[in-house]
Amino acid sequence: MGTTTMGVKLDDATRERIKSAATRIDRTPHWLIKQAIFSYLEQLENSDTLPELPALLSGAANESDEAPTPAEEPHQPFLDFAEQILPQSVSRAAITAAYRRPETEAVSMLLEQARLPQPVAEQAHKLAYQLADKLRNQKNASGRAGMVQGLLQEFSLSSQEGVALMCLAEALLRIPDKATRDALIRDKISNGNWQSHIGRSPSLFVNAATWGLLFTGKLVSTHNEASLSRSLNRIIGKSGEPLIRKGVDMAMRLMGEQFVTGETIAEALANARKLEEKGFRYSYDMLGEAALTAADAQAYMVSYQQAIHAIGKASNGRGIYEGPGISIKLSALHPRYSRAQYDRVMEELYPRLKSLTLLARQYDIGINIDAEEADRLEISLDLLEKLCFEPELAGWNGIGFVIQAYQKRCPLVIDYLIDLATRSRRRLMIRLVKGAYWDSEIKRAQMDGLEGYPVYTRKVYTDVSYLACAKKLLAVPNLIYPQFATHNAHTLAAIYQLAGQNYYPGQYEFQCLHGMGEPLYEQVTGKVADGKLNRPCRIYAPVGTHETLLAYLVRRLLENGANTSFVNRIADTSLPLDELVADPVTAVEKLAQQEGQTGLPHPKIPLPRDLYGHGRDNSAGLDLANEHRLASLSSALLNSALQKWQALPMLEQPVAAGEMSPVINPAEPKDIVGYVREATPREVEQALESAVNNAPIWFATPPAERAAILHRAAVLMESQMQQLIGILVREAGKTFSNAIAEVREAVDFLHYYAGQVRDDFANETHRPLGPVVCISPWNFPLAIFTGQIAAALAAGNSVLAKPAEQTPLIAAQGIAILLEAGVPPGVVQLLPGRGETVGAQLTGDDRVRGVMFTGSTEVATLLQRNIASRLDAQGRPIPLIAETGGMNAMIVDSSALTEQVVIDVLASAFDSAGQRCSALRVLCLQDEIADHTLKMLRGAMAECRMGNPGRLTTDIGPVIDSEAKVNIERHIQTMRSKGRPVFQAVRENSEDAREWQSGTFVAPTLIELDDFAEL
């Protein structure tokens, strides 16, 4: 007997029959079994008698020699999504569960794990004090490093001038043309208060730089002032701005060189020799951010291969612990490195990772997989696990992985890595860092409305986490080679004491960043006889040109400039050293005494839910990189697909169903999402009467009570998010990310308008209009639909809602939620139907006192004409609030980072299949960057996947209906016939191609124009 993954026991013959049948229809046995179960369940639910089992499973049918032609498969919505949910082991499930757990819970668990025994704590504090004291009292660093350190210390990110310098450093080096560079300099320098920095630093370079920036700032800010003398104008005109440009350019390049070991791997290896002679080791990183195109990924792959060859030869047999190594960024090796593209990552990225690792093994140099954003952690663990069980890598201990102490999951990740090392019979190199993406993790969680942060909101909690994790790593020396990356003297000293005095080569190592940590580790690496600690330090050494430096440089500037950074604080002589090297466990306990609870989050960093303070709640999102959330969503989607969705007119009194029309999924014509019936003229008349009769009752309802009802509706809508997502995906062709955003926006509208009338709103001063007609679009069938209605209801108006013809089902659910929340049935009514019939009857009725419309400019103009001649009882025009389309443009000059431009263009132009009124239509590029930008844009477009939005992998869904598809394709063909270059490309597989033929899909399209007149 065998057991399927669904737990169904089958004899071997039946299993073979299922396998054979599944192969004939190009499906998996697992899919076929689930399909049979779903079909049988549906028959049971719709029948009073027990249906016979399908022949395939009952054994009633025999296989013939010639396979019959399979019948057309019934469409099962969201089955593909369900098949993409990944099984998890106990240890992996624990990691996921800790993703965004409350800080109070996480920190309380960490404290005891991080606490140092009293003798160790005392020794660690003493050593940390000595290290910090020497670091602070040593002579100012000489040469380039000292200049940059002084400049960064003086111009911190808390000042306008510091921000200006960071902006310059981030952008200036990539701008190819002088005019744009001059414009950027004027923008960033002219408003700085540079005088305030004169004389504050003991560094001659910093003071000279300040005087230069002051003079530069005056030159720039007064360049166009009428009071400036002609002679000064001539000086500036002839040499001023070029001189400024050269000076600032030199300063920025100086700053860049501070953090980069060399522009090429050969140069970096040569530059490393000096510190290698002192006992330092190196791990080289080829600079660059995430690949956006296949060409980017291939270029990074070649760069890593060349680097491994060069590093391997330079290692000359020193081995993984004593010799140099390499660090690789997985997002550089694949343009779609994300959970949503899991299968592609495993099929395409993994072979590249394996190839690089085998090459590193050939030279016996360590290869570390760098840590990136939090949502990529778990997919990186899957890649690591697969790598660890490769037969060709058996017995080799050079595989390394980076973990981030600021992540709440970090201790559990270590437990998993220890287990992985045990199962794969190897010793893993684990680099423990504090984390370099803190700002973006906080912002992303806030923007996406997630339940919490993946990282700690207080730096001291990260320090506690680091110690707890360090103890875990040191406890299993046979399984883990710990690599402690820190610039903090107390952390360094604590690890030194915890590891003990019986150090042996290969026990552990420290690590630091090139350009930041060398002064501290000059005291650590070297012989005891020379006053050193005789512990190895490996320098993380970025390699690349100044043009590839940008994002890395910003992270380093943020790290240096943060007022909680040890690197920043050590230079602040007003800060006592005892405070600088305080034990973080003690510091957290003091905080707990002051605040009454352990682990409270930073008071100035509210949870995403509380982002807007007491005014209103932030809407809750859904994390599509969280395996537990995906499993929950999958279950809800399958259940949603079994519901019989209907959109009937929803009046004060119930109506008969009558003859109904199917609502078809635009991505899959075989999928009938539900049924709709258009409101009859008589029902529209009844609704108008009810709206008039109920208007005074709703107006008399206190604003605070109206607000409470809208708040309840928001809570209800949020609780039903998953089933609403299911309708939006099938009825409106929304991708999952779009559908989540749609529900969130609707919830936000309800909270927002409730907040507007809850406090400072009185019936005496804010009188309603009366019955208001709300006509909403299909591109935001829940968000704009809800927003219009919520605004009208909050102000005390009765509402007649006509949804778009294409999306009545989601509108019906929105109205049902409002009614459940307490809006009286006659106050809000749903009238599905066409604009020519239902819409015309509503807007043409004299009892209507206001119209809210979102849609085309053409229809808005018609509405304006129709109601312009009508006046209300007080002789005022009937208000029309119309939101229409436009021709949206993006203007890009050469100061813009090309990668960011491409990301933004893809999101604005092609997200929602380009069907937003705010969607990008015209991209205007500066000549100097046009070719490069277009090349990258085409490559990124080719990586997008267009298909059924019911799959997690889909980036671009269908346009709303066949009429829209025909109109768009006609325009594209017209441009082709005029000789305009047209580019269309998406990633294609056989399943997508079949869908494109039946669904209403239009590939993302780029058309090159010479003139706006061609639009």
Say what each PLM segment does.
Residues 1-10, 19, 23:
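Short Lys/Arg-rich basic patches
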Residues 28-51:
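Short, basic amphipathic alpha-helical segments that act as recognition/interaction helices
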Residues 43-67:
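Short, positively charged interaction helices/loops
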Residues 63-618:
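Positively charged, amphipathic and often flexible ligand-engagement surfaces
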Residues 292, 359-363, 374-388, 395-401, ...:
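Long, K/E/R/D-enriched contiguous segments that form extended
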Residues 531-533, 543-544, 548-551, 555-689, ...:
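Terminal low-complexity tails and localization/encapsulation signals of metabolic enzymes
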Residues 729, 755-902, 953:
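Rossmann-like NAD(P) dinucleotide-binding subdomain of oxidoreductase/dehydrogenase enzymes
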Residues 820-822, 844-846, 850, 858-1012:
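ALDH superfamily catalytic-core signature
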